[in-house]
């Protein structure tokens, strides 16, 4: 190395890391992705559920044929991610879930997709649904006709909401009794015993309880939310799965709810603080309004 005057410089040491450090740093950054629009463009703008489920045309015969091949699964295919199909498993990732998304983010569509997917892969004697829509019933209107749906509750009938909690408590006790009579430690043990015994034991379908706008319910019926926490705690081993969804999670996600919901999905939120309430990260607050259905999941 020489100076501007041409004089040679010796014993010069570069003020930079060793070559190995660059490789280490690059490998550490490789799995990380930015949050900007250019990164979001790597994902499709929309995905047809029928294409993912491979049931085109969607006939009753095609669904029944799928049931005949198994008809029992806790895996729900929800869309497409960077690495291909994106699915969640109520047992592996749950057993309970928390979902948030502001107006226009695609929350209702996500809930419908969750219910529809599980209906396709489960016979009605393997999984049932109780759907609670605290916005008035629009989100689950089509789902009410599924043979799996055993209850649809809306905010239009407060007494029915209160009765639903009593009924869920009775269902917990019934399941505990049924497992005890079969000497089964949990729902998986019971289902295995039933399969090995030629289905002599009576059916015990998993129960998916989906509540849209639970934040509004928490304000108007706080005792219902307390009851739900009890159901979440006791229902883990009984085959009961709770999905809580809201537009505005602020203040509604209590420590008890957070402790009992391992699976969390955040569509676009109004700000980064609401994103942190759900997935413990700010990212969903930066999702573009031009991308409804885009979400981050904490598994």
Explain the meaning of each model-derived region.
Residues 1-26, 64-186, 199-277, 286-288:
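P-loop NTPase catalytic phosphate-binding loop
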Residues 2-54, 286-299:
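Conserved AAA+ ATPase small/helical "lid" subdomain
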Residues 30-84, 89:
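AAA+ P-loop ATPase motor domain of ring mechanoenzymes
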Residues 49-56, 185-201:
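Amphipathic alpha-helical surface "interface" segments used
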Residues 280:
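Phosphate-coordinating loops and pocket residues in cytosolic domains that bind phosphorylated ligands
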